[in-house]
Amino acid sequence: MPIWVDADACPKVIKEVLYRAADREQMMVTLVANQSLSVPPSKFLRTLRVAAGFDVADNEIVQRAQSGDLVITADIPLAAEVMEKGAIALNPRGERYSVATIRERLTMRDFMDTMRASGVQTGGPPALNQRDRQQFANELDKWLQQQRK
């Protein structure tokens, strides 16, 4: 099963974890972005550049992802869509989305959008830290182990 990465917003340290995993596991990782990406040479890494525009990369991932694939994204609506197709969604902080958590996250996202639209400054998520990176690597390893069975 391939791995799809919403690469425009994916932190560099997470991409580096994915680059190493792709070669180690000989698993195809496709990074989808609306800008040029520089990736190390590997027959297991592929970039897919899409046109600039709102949700163009997300729509490409939804179109291509299949049941059992892994999608790396912090975009909650994208995660919800690929999960409807049977794909697994994992965010760069190592949280594997479930049906229950995705509903909760969509509700919170909509609430925060409403707050921002009314002029409230909500700030963004905290910076990615070493614990987040380790959690991501652990969840990725769990998924990779499941693929070996």
Curated annotation (Swiss-Prot):
InterPro entries: UPF0178
Superkingdom: Bacteria
Pfam families referenced in this protein's UniProt entry, alphabetically: DUF188
Family: Belongs to the UPF0178 family.
PANTHER family in alphabetical order: UPF0178 PROTEIN YAII
Name of the protein described by the UniProt record: UPF0178 protein ETA_25650
Protein species of origin: Erwinia tasmaniensis (strain DSM 17950 / CFBP 7177 / CIP 109463 / NCPPB 4357 / Et1/99)
